[in-house]
Design a protein with these regions (language model features):
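Short acidic-glycine loop/turn motifs at beta-strand connectors
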Residues: 31, 72, 134-137, 148-149, ...
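Short beta-strand-to-loop capping motifs
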Residues: 39, 79-83, 134, 160
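Residues forming anionic-ligand binding surfaces in small-molecule and nucleic-acid pockets
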Residues: 63-81, 169-175
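Short, conserved charged micro-motifs
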Residues: 45-47, 85-90, 166-168
Length: 214
């Protein structure tokens, strides 16, 4: 999964340097149970180190910010865009696509409303304006960015079926329940991909390169 992060950074660099590339979007899954650490997280709890030593999790650092994210059973997206929108506006454009796409599948999402504070250990332990929560108040999608030279990389994790036991071991909190959709992750990704292409004119995205390889 270190290669995934390198590929995402390479996509950002290509978006910056190549005038033909406006935006890239990739979807992928993680093999095994991985915990990604936000770029600005300085320390990790001792019990995480113990879980790593015991082989219960793997740990990698993301180039994007935010708190720690457990990648297991969900969907990751990585989007790069060659625009210098204000950060809030860039999150809003992406989230509007996600809200519309999941509404079409029967899942209603809304913006988080927690105030920004110091980085919380668990990304999914708080819901900011950059995040999306479901109708029952569970955070379903957490997103974070890296901004560089007039472009940005946005990572997002869509929690569809997180492992409850491992989640509690890591965060000492209950995991969100399995998402109430009778679809596989592959089917969700296909819908997101099609929805993005269909509505790109409404969200100011064009010249899109999409790769949903796992």
């Amino acid at each position: 999964m270190y290669k995934r992060q390198a590929l995402d950074l390479n996509s950002l660099d290509q978006t910056i340097s190549n005038p033909e590339i406006i935006l890239t979007l990739r979807f992928y899954y993680w093999t095994g149970d991985w915990l990604s650490i936000g770029y600005h997280q300085k320390e990790i709890p001792l019990h995480w180190e113990n879980l790593l030593s015991n082989g219960e999790i793997n740990i990698v650092r993301r180039p994007s910010g935010g708190g720690a994210v457990l990648h297991s059973g969900g969907i990751t997206y990585a989007l790069t865009f060659k625009k210098t929108y204000y950060k809030v506006l860039s999150y809003e454009m992406v989230n509007n696509w996600l809200i519309k796409s999941f509404r079409e599948l029967g899942l209603n999402l809304r913006y988080g409303n927690s105030r920004k504070s110091s980085i919380k250990t668990n990304c999914f332990g708080t819901s900011l304006i950059s995040d999306l929560v479901d109708q029952d108040g569970f955070k379903r999608i957490g997103s974070a960015q890296l901004r560089k030279k007039g472009a940005f990389l946005q990572h997002g994790e869509i929690q569809t079926n997180p492992p409850r036991d491992l989640w509690f071991k890591l965060f000492k909190e209950e995991a969100p329940p399995k998402v109430n959709l009778k679809l596989t992750n592959d089917e969700i990704v296909q819908h997101l991909r099609n929805s993005f292409l269909k509505n790109k004119s409404n969200i100011n995205f064009k010249n899109i390169a999409i790769d949903n390889k796992k």
